[in-house]
């Protein structure tokens, strides 16, 4: 089985294109497995500044077809031209897939380097794929190893020790822009009830903010504030809350964005400045709100440009952990890939031995001599299999496991069966209730 990934991030393309690509991302994995025979597994990682698709296919010969199938699906779901979609994604294969995901999960590839929110997003991406039955066994191992690597980086280095995140940097920027930097006096309206909104609520509380209202176009605000505090808003109470707000923060990414004309009308008699923080990749606020008098607009691009740099020592230590973990994972995966071939060779050889022993017993009976012959033959077979087994491990370590499998098929006619591609959700030990609460 071959792993690959399609990667579109803030580092390579503008965030507007990332946002457009990610439209329909929740449907991609299932659609790809349904419509394509060459994509045997898929996990989608979509965050505020990246859209990545991790896939698995049976062999390297199917790789281009699998990529094309995913590009076609993304084009259909997003409404973007297929050529534009193809150009927007970098394709990773081989060890680069592992190294990239491990770095992403550890926060090394984030707009705010060292931020910890991404580790949870990587974990939730796997859980979602497991629920939908699109996570192949190889992808499950990859994402679980990435999560473990992120934990190791957090435990063994000072990377992220300042607790920086996209939300915290955005709030720091808002503090710098505000005439009054005291959050205890501010009225805040939060749009959204997902994981980002939850992180925003927590950080606002840490800064002393108590007057927080929450709006959800899907009607989830009541349940959200029931466990986190704050005031739930609906369509009727939202305008008054926005009119009185000092800060409004967009975390939902819904289709119901706040238009500049509507905001101007609602705040016509406000008489005080407003800071609008748009953390949604697909924009909760019309970009034109930043042109309104008395309104300062902060976006993900603002956060990226303002993000402080981590210390070189922490980055070096974290990178070493990521590289070591990626190398170990690849070595284990390559060794594992020949296990089925080794088992197939042993089964083939033992079947031949058993067939010959049946002939011996049929001719001579179950005598002591027959038992001695069988014992000698089994010992000889074990010795004969030793070198092919050792060579299999050596070839796998050098990435030549396919050569070994091809040799078995050419010399002995042994067909090596690939392991089952997909891991159904019902067989995966995931906490589905926790997932639902985090994505609400």
Curated annotation (Swiss-Prot):
Identification of the protein by name: Glutamyl-tRNA reductase
Reactions that this protein is recorded to catalyse: (S)-4-amino-5-oxopentanoate + tRNA(Glu) + NADP(+) = L-glutamyl-tRNA(Glu) + NADPH + H(+)
Any further remark recorded for this protein: During catalysis, the active site Cys acts as a nucleophile attacking the alpha-carbonyl group of tRNA-bound glutamate with the formation of a thioester intermediate between enzyme and glutamate, and the concomitant release of tRNA(Glu). The thioester intermediate is finally reduced by direct hydride transfer from NADPH, to form the product GSA.
Classification via InterPro entries: 4pyrrol_synth_GluRdtase, 4pyrrol_synth_GluRdtase_dimer, 4pyrrol_synth_GluRdtase_N, GluRdtase_CS, GluRdtase_dimer_dom_sf, GluRdtase_N_sf, NAD(P)-bd_dom_sf, Shikm_DH/Glu-tRNA_Rdtase
Family: Belongs to the glutamyl-tRNA reductase family.
Encoding gene, per UniProt annotation: hemA
Binding-site list for substrate: 47-50, 110, 115-117, 121
Subunit structure, interactors included: Homodimer.
EC number(s) recorded for this UniProt protein: 1.2.1.70
